[in-house]
Amino acid sequence: MSLQDNFKYKEYWRKAGLKKYYGQIFVDLVKQQNPKNFLEIGVFTGVTARNVCELLYLINNKDFFYLGIDLFEDFHEAISNEVVPEFLVKKQNFSNPLKSFVYNFLLKEKLNSLDSVSKFLKKFQNNVELKKGNSLNILSQTDLKIFDMIFVDGGHSYETVKFELDIILKNIKDNCLVVCDDYSLQEATGVKKAIDESVRENSFNFKVVANRFACLSKK
């Protein structure tokens, strides 16, 4: 069994968008796709990015590329009807009081800032590019055909997800896998609506994994 087959998702000592159970399911999807070039929309604190880069390194050694797009600390610039994570709204309110003390008082570090995420991914700095800004602007200027896998987990409004998928699904290569998070999230029903419409309009293969991850690929 290879090292990548044995790879286990780690939450590290940060705030993770994916907890261990769903994180492992996600990295198993990455293993199945076996990508070299990876795009993530919605980096948050970089935990998923770090796991992806660790896995890409096992698969490709130093020959891989990760691109992450996020508003980072400028999340307040999102469109007015956007769904913002409670963790950001409450100014890094950790459930773990020790984490709160260390990050908010001792280090004074905003985990979703570009600087913090860059430091967290420094191990792979030659393979990683982080772009700060609105995905609606950045995607249209990005060559999406280079990516083998795209993880969509940024804005959760219908408008944002639909716009992102309109660009992505029309510009990816044939064997690219697009995975959208939070397909069944009740607090953001616009995600499911946008995905369902995009699948119908583009006639893509579609399946939902673990009642959470919507997987799209060309027929």
Q: Could you tell me what each predicted segment is?
A:
Residues 1-219:
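A short alpha-helical cap/connector motif
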